[in-house]
């Protein structure tokens, strides 16, 4: 059931403020329209077509049906978890299910209050505003969101000093969907204003296999179920990586003039791209090797590892560490990062004894 739109934000023509004059900055197209359309086609459009995240889907299904029954907007939703697990896709699915628009932006793009103000005033009843990397919102922008989320009201300060006045503008009832890889970095006032807070987990191999088979069908790629499974096993539990690896294996099969992707061909291709059987790439192995060879397995601080590898500390923490922690190759303690026995064995090295001193009896 679609939500009725009023399309009126009750703005007075006499209100003049920088906050009400958002600049429209044209963005360069980084990819061709055909490529963008293809990428969009890989995303499922409805909740029933979304593979994986079973518990989360049930929570969202109930929220959608309840909101439709009351003809209301869905409560504000915070999605958190490692990158590439489908947070943006879920926001688009919510909009499709609710038959409303979805406006997509990222916190770093909302540098000035006028940026978020323009977005909020343009929203119609039921619309979804998706903010990626929401933990990176600056203080002023975040404070503007508080009354917007809670009371659907925008408070704007007119003038300066003692003559300053606060004018409140009514907003359409909308849904804010925030996405973050660092939920602990959100302030309590912002986090507490989300009615739904849901975590996305890494995907199982069989779920990634289904995603790869679906993507292969869309891209007209011939692949066997076992070939899809071989790619899924190296996809780090992440759909975005699974689709990327499929495209690289597709290129390899095309050049090698192979009509179908099977496990042997997939392994050959991914070995060429230095993606091993657990999905670790060159940088993953570099982090583990550096920790083991230069720091005797740890414990070692993140900055020290970053300096030794030449990688950005934030990149290591947000891109590489989550999967290494998930598969048990890395441990984080109050003293720093530690390579586990499994990491030594994966790299073909003999772990020291005892590897983890705190486990000694």
From Swiss-Prot:
Keywords per UniProt: ATP-binding, Cytoplasm, DNA damage, DNA recombination, DNA repair, DNA-binding, Hydrolase, Nucleotide-binding
Region (Head domain (RuvB-H)): 277-361
Span list, region Disordered: 1-41
EC number, UniProt record: 3.6.4.-
Region entry Small ATPAse domain (RuvB-S), spans: 204-274
Binding sites annotated in the UniProt record for Mg(2+): 88
Composition bias type Polar residues, residue spans: 1-15, 28-40
Induction line: 2-3 fold induced by UV light.
Primary location: cytoplasm
Gene Ontology cellular-component annotations: cytoplasm; Holliday junction resolvase complex
Large ATPase domain (RuvB-L), as annotated region: 13-203
Binding site for DNA: 332, 337
GO function term, MF aspect, one: four-way junction DNA binding
Domain of life: Bacteria
Keyword Transcription in annotation: no
Cellular compartment(s): Cytoplasm
Catalytic activity: ATP + H2O = ADP + phosphate + H(+)
Transmembrane segments: none
Knocked-out gene: effects: No visible phenotype; cells are more sensitive to UV-C light, H(2)O(2), CdSO(4), SeO(3) and SeO(4).
Positions that bind ATP: 42-43, 84, 87-89, 150-152, 193, 203, 240
Miscellaneous note of the record: This bacterium is considerably more resistant to UV and gamma irradiation than E.coli; the E.coli-like SOS regulon model is not an appropriate model for DNA repair in this cyanobacterium.
Assembly: Homohexamer. Forms an RuvA(8)-RuvB(12)-Holliday junction (HJ) complex. HJ DNA is sandwiched between 2 RuvA tetramers; dsDNA enters through RuvA and exits via RuvB. An RuvB hexamer assembles on each DNA strand where it exits the tetramer. Each RuvB hexamer is contacted by two RuvA subunits (via domain III) on 2 adjacent RuvB subunits; this complex drives branch migration. In the full resolvosome a probable DNA-RuvA(4)-RuvB(12)-RuvC(2) complex forms which resolves the HJ.
Protein role: The RuvA-RuvB-RuvC complex processes Holliday junction (HJ) DNA during genetic recombination and DNA repair, while the RuvA-RuvB complex plays an important role in the rescue of blocked DNA replication forks via replication fork reversal (RFR). RuvA specifically binds to HJ cruciform DNA, conferring on it an open structure. The RuvB hexamer acts as an ATP-dependent pump, pulling dsDNA into and through the RuvAB complex. RuvB forms 2 homohexamers on either side of HJ DNA bound by 1 or 2 RuvA tetramers; 4 subunits per hexamer contact DNA at a time.
UniProt protein name: Holliday junction branch migration complex subunit RuvB
Organism: Synechocystis sp. (strain ATCC 27184 / PCC 6803 / Kazusa)
Gene: ruvB
